[in-house]
Structure formats: structure tokens, C-alpha cells
Curated annotation (Swiss-Prot):
The lineage of its organism: Eukaryota, Metazoa, Ecdysozoa, Arthropoda, Hexapoda. It comes from the Eukaryota. This is Leukopyrokinin. Mediates visceral muscle contractile activity (myotropic activity). The modification Pyrrolidone carboxylic acid is found at Q1. The keyword Disulfide bond does not apply. One of its GO terms (biological process) is neuropeptide signaling pathway. The keyword rRNA-binding does not apply. Belongs to the pyrokinin family. Keywords: Amidation, Neuropeptide, Pyrrolidone carboxylic acid, Secreted. An analog without the N-terminal PCA residue was synthesized and found to exhibit greater activity (144%) than the parent neuropeptide. The portion of the sequence of LPK most critical for the myotropic properties is limited to the pentapeptide fragment FTPRL.
Length: 8
């Protein structure tokens, strides 16, 4: 599972 979650 590859999930990209951008964090500020």
C-alpha cells in the first residue's frame, strides 16, 4: 500500500 499524505 502506497499512500502519499502531504503534511503542512
Amino acid at each position: 500500500q502506497t499512500s502519499f499524505t502531504p503534511r503542512l
